[in-house]
Amino acid sequence: MKVVLVAPAAALISLLGAVPAAADPGSGPSYAPPFVDHTEWVYWGGLSSLRVYPTPSGRAASRMSGTAGADPQAADKAWSEVLARSPDADTPGMRAQFVCHWQFAEIGQPGKTSWNLEPWRPVVDDAQ
């Protein structure tokens, strides 16, 4: 009977001991660059759109945006990765669209294949 009780208890203890590193506030974030896998320009009806494909780490970092454990520079690092892959994205309004996706895409539509940025959209600043 002891063996029957000890085995499940040992299994439970090992599971409880396997807490992810992110659960320890002193260990830092559980994500790291690269945040962007690749980008791709596409055209629909004469309008261009930049598809940004985040990495799993990018998705994790974006979900942390605005929380106590978040890296406040993560969105800037990710935007730098976008510009490294698609320098033409450096136009008015594109960074604001990216930051909007960074903050809300994984909440509104988790796991969406790409975050789509459109340079033809009106420029909206943070105050709007």
What are these regions (language model features)?
Residues 1-39:
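N-terminal prepro-regions of secreted/extracellular proteins
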Residues 44:
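Extracellular/periplasmic catalytic domains that process cell-envelope and extracellular macromolecules
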Residues 78-128:
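Extracytosolic low-complexity repeat regions of secreted or lipid-anchored proteins
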Residues 21, 50-51, 115:
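A broad, low-specificity signal marking well-ordered, structured residues that form hydrophobic/aromatic
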Residues 48-87:
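Acidic/histidine-rich, surface-exposed loop or edge segments in extracytoplasmic proteins
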Residues 39, 48-52, 56, 124-128:
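Charged, amphipathic alpha-helical regulatory modules used
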